[in-house]
C-alpha cells in the first residue's frame, strides 16, 4: 500500500512537471490539471472546453489559453519528432500511415523501423509490450510504443492495417479468420 501511494505521488509530480515545462504554467495550475485527471498534452489540447471551465478558477479565457499553449507545445514536439525521424531515414510510407503520431514514428525509427514494410513485420507485443518466460521467470518486455499507452488490441489493429495497405493480406482473409475464431468459440461453449 505504501508503494502504491509512493507510485501515485511520483506520477502526480511527473505529470505536474510535464505541464509546467511544456505549457509554461505555474505549479498550482499544473497540479489542478493533474488533480482533475489530465495526464498528457493531447487531453488538455483537445478536450471539450467545458471540461476545463468546470475546474475551479478556470474561466473561458483561461481554458482557451491553456488549450492554445497545449496545442502550440504539441506542434513543436511533433515538428521536432518529424525532423528527427527524417534524419533517421524514415520513409514517407510510414509518415502517411494513419494511426501513428510523429512521436511514435520517431520511437520506431530509433529502433530501426523506418518503412511501412518494417512496421508490418512487427508483432503486437513488440509494440505494446508484454511478458515472456525466461529461465522459468516471468519477464516484462517493454514495447516500442508502450510509453504511448498502446494496447495489444491497438497494436494488432495497426499492424493488420499496415499489412492490408501493403496487400500482404486481404479483407476476405481476415473475415474468414474471424469466422473460424467465432466458430471455435462456439464449439468451446457447447462442449
Name each region found by the language model.
Residues 1-191:
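C-terminal extensions
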Amino acid at each position: 500500500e505504501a508503494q502504491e501511494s509512493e507510485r501515485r505521488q511520483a506520477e502526480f509530480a511527473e505529470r505536474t512537471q510535464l505541464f509546467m515545462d511544456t505549457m509554461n504554467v505555474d505549479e498550482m495550475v499544473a497540479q489542478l490539471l493533474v488533480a482533475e485527471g489530465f495526464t498528457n498534452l493531447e487531453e488538455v489540447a483537445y478536450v471539450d472546453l467545458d471540461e476545463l471551465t468546470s475546474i475551479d478558477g478556470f474561466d473561458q479565457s483561461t481554458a482557451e489559453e491553456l488549450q492554445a499553449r497545449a496545442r502550440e507545445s504539441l506542434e513543436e514536439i511533433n515538428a521536432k519528432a518529424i525532423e528527427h525521424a527524417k534524419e533517421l531515414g524514415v520513409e514517407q510510407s510510414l509518415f502517411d500511415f494513419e494511426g501513428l503520431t510523429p512521436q511514435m514514428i520517431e520511437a520506431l525509427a530509433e529502433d530501426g523501423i523506418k518503412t511501412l514494410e518494417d512496421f508490418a513485420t512487427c508483432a503486437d507485443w513488440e509494440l505494446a509490450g508484454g511478458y515472456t518466460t525466461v529461465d522459468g521467470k516471468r519477464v516484462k518486455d517493454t514495447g516500442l510504443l508502450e510509453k504511448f499507452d498502446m494496447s495489444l488490441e491497438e497494436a494488432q489493429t495497426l499492424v493488420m492495417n499496415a499489412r492490408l495497405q501493403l496487400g500482404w493480406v486481404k479483407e476476405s482473409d481476415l473475415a474468414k479468420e474471424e469466422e473460424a475464431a467465432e466458430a471455435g468459440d462456439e464449439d468451446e461453449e457447447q462442449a
